[in-house]
Amino acid sequence: MEFTDLVEDRRSVHDYADADLDRETIEAILREAVYAPSSYNLQPWEFLVVGEDANRERLQEVAYGQPQVTDAPVTLVVFGRLDPAAHVDRVLADQVEKGYRDEASAAATRESIEAMREYPEAERRVWTAKSTALAAMSLMFAARERGVATCPMGGFDAEALVEEFAVPDGYEPVMLVTMGYAAEDADDETLPRKFRRPVEE
């Protein structure tokens, strides 16, 4: 699919067919999603794939009962890590090895990244959400390329989600993304596309 067609074709789908999404497809989508850009290439995202019926019901509880969480065969919880330096060793070693930086530049960059650990938590939440949202958007395009529908969701109780799924400290739930094959009569697929503000504005 041409990229323009892909962008214009993607919809936020709320009604899903009663069809499973196989592990191979999910992994292929995730492999492409992680090519998204991120601050310093630190890739702070993590993905929790929620597919078991009982677990989707638990997730629906913390998502204010929204039906698409259990209608879709899979919902991804997209997390951002609050520790900016979690992957700094591998990231900088790779950049030195491939010629993007010399050792001195890598050392200076490491110092800057490690200093970010001292930022207030609210600032680190904003930092991780920015990069993680880019990966989530890439994920939705990768899914659509394969005929898989998605819907990003910001409506959920983050604290309740962390408690319900025993999420370790340092992981911020950024969004949910439902994923599956759209129902044949899904309004989001059959009706004309919703209004978009013109670029001229």
Residue spans for each PLM region:
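A generic local secondary-structure boundary/capping motif
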Residues: 64-67, 140, 164-167
